[in-house]
Every structure is written in structure tokens, then in C-alpha cells.
Amino acid sequence: MTNKLTFTRPDDWHLHLRDGKAMQSVLPDTARRFARAMIMPNLKLPVVTTEQAAAYRARILSALPQELVGQFEPLMTLYLTDTTTPEEISRAKASGIVQAVKLYPAGATTHSDAGVTDIDRCKATLAMMEKLDMPLLVHGEVVDPAVDIFDREKIFIDRVLIPLLQRFPGLRVVFEHITTREAVEFVQSISNRIAATITAHHLMLNRNALFTGGLQPHHYCLPVLKREIHRQALVAAATSGHSRFFLGTDSAPHPLKDKESACGCAGIYSAHAAIEFYAEIFEQAGRLDRLEAFASFYGPDFYGLPRNTDQISLSKESWQIPGEVEFGGDRLVPLRAGEQVCWRL
């Protein structure tokens, strides 16, 4: 039995930090575990310009606790809209701080109202991204109300993603937080210009977790949890050693009152034990030897960034996740609140 894991410090390639006091509450959880994180731009006022991305980055860095200063690098993204210009993409690329552009279909998830209503309106901008090798990060769900919510990812592949890649074959794309066997098979079958992130919660939970023992709002996220066959396909992909599947938590904190309400928000907070969760998942699959590559190598390799040189260690030691944590003056219920985790940072 392995009692200690020491490996290259990982990165989180999909993270929601929020802003202000809320960000100050959750940022240390990520910065203690990860060297870098790809910061999502869907604030209440979306990050749509390079100038806004630079200002947000400065706020993140200033919010780091003193003991973590210099140990964490936020990687910034822009929020793609119908009116994002090719010139803005050029500015973003030249800035050196914007690493990617995020596509949210309008209405697909939290703070996505300003997202893209028709991908054809972005043709010139996407062409510039292809030319400059600026990656596109995709929330892969259609928002057609006629499509069943459990099929939105599968339909997105056929309706949006395949035509997009045919039109822009040189565009680098990350299929974010995949949740289905179809998404796994698509990434495996396509060129090396497309990769996918996989969350801890989609690896651990299937859609039964939404309803077992009553409605469970803290397990509600978008894309929603899927059938067990899809969870198993995700675990197989994450632990396969395939270099185009890598870690992205999609950790998305919301106040307790916004989760336990008549119209609850989508999002699961996992940053408090993210790498520990992944270690559990890989251990259960008998693939602890492949955790380092998934968490620390494949992401930077795909983005053309250097791998981290420092290390972290996890000990085989059980600890209990608190039932609630402070969140910018509110309370937050973390993933697996009150439960034991068998690895400890």
C-alpha cells in the first residue's frame, strides 16, 4: 500500500474564483494545491477585454495570503461574446497574460447571459484565434429548450463542435468539463488540436447523487451529473494515460443561501480538497501511477507551457471535510461536506 505520494505540483485548468471578499475566502484552497489555474471570466460583469483581464489578475494576486505570494499564477481568459473583435484577440495575445478565450453559449450556465448567441457571428474572431494560436475553451452544451438537459453535451458535439473544427481546423480547443461517453470518444477520435478537462465531481458522482435521500442542491452543477455508464467512461479516460485528458476542477463556489433556494445556482465547490479527491479516484481505479501526468503534465503540454518544477506531497491520512466554511461573509457547503477523505495535503 502507498502511504505517501510526492509528485510535480499540479495545475487546475478550469477554476471559478469569483471576486472581492468571496475570492479572498476560496483562493487559498487552490493556491496551496496548484501552481497555476485557468481563471474563468464569467464574473457578474464578464471579463471581455484584455484590460479587464489584467485588472482581475491584479486583484487575484493581491488577495493571496502572504505565505502564498509567489507560489501561484493565475492564467487569464476572455469571455467570448457576439461582439468580441479580432483586434481584441490580438491585444490579448500580445499581453502575455491572456491564455485562452472562453465560449459560453448564452444561457448555458452561471453568468452566461452575455455569451454567444450564434457562433457564426464570431467567424472573424475565431479566424484570428486560429491564426494566433489562441485556444478556445468551450462549455459544450446546446441551449435549445427542445433538447433534453441530459443530452445537451452529446447534441453540442454534432451541432456545434464538429462544424466548428471543420471550419477552423487549426484552432486549438479545450472541451471543458466533459460528462459523457460520447465526449470521451469524440476527443479520442479527433486530431491533437482538441483536449478535454475532467472534474473531480463528475468522476465521483452520477446523477443519482442529485436525488438520493431527497433533493441534493449541493450536487447540482452544469453540465449536470450523468448516468453511471458515463461516469465510468470518464474515469477510464482520466486514468488511461491519454495525453489530451487533464485536470480541471470547475470548482464553482456559491453561498449556501443561493444553493438552498427555490431556484438554486449551479456549481460545486471542490477546491478545498481537489487534488485529494483526484488521488482517491485514481487509487480506486488502481492507477495512482498515472495521477501525476493527468494532474501535472498533460495540461501544460497541451497549452505549450513549461511543466512545474516544484512538488507537493499527499499522505494516506483520513480527515473530515467541514460541513460549512466561511465565504465572503456568507457560508459555503463544500463537496462531500462532513465526509472523510483518505488523502491529506
Swiss-Prot record:
Stored Pfam families: Amidohydro_1
Gene3D superfamilies according to UniProt: Metal-dependent hydrolases (3.20.20.140)
Positions bearing N6-carboxylysine: 102
Residues that coordinate or bind substrate: 16-18, 42, 139, 222, 254, 266
NCBIfam families: pyrC_dimer
PANTHER family cross-referenced by the UniProt entry: DIHYDROOROTASE (PTHR43137:SF1)
Protein name according to UniProt: Dihydroorotase
Organism: Nitrosomonas eutropha (strain DSM 101675 / C91 / Nm57)
UniProt gene name: pyrC
